[in-house]
Amino acid sequence: MTLKERLNADFKEAMKNKQTVRKETISFVRAAIKQYEVDNREEIDDAGIASILAKQVKMRKDALADFEKAGRTDLVESYNAEIEVLTRYLPEQLSEDSERL
């Protein structure tokens, strides 16, 4: 199952289970994927989707720092939940210990 198929299946599951944060986060990612495909007139592969996911996580982490400084705990919690959803689809990063081996 490709990453795109997995996102679509998880989106449907989130809708059925009324998981709004998960559904909205996956929806944002699906929109970014669709935008890429329309702009470049080509089907995106898993590596491209992983790149989009990494950018989405980075954007949310950058905004998270600003929200923490401003004391917006509601947005901090929301963005943390979105980051958690997004990181489920990213490939696992090698730890520093594994890199040394």
Model feature map: region roles:
Residues 1-101:
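N-terminal cationic and glycine-rich segments that engage phosphates or anionic surfaces
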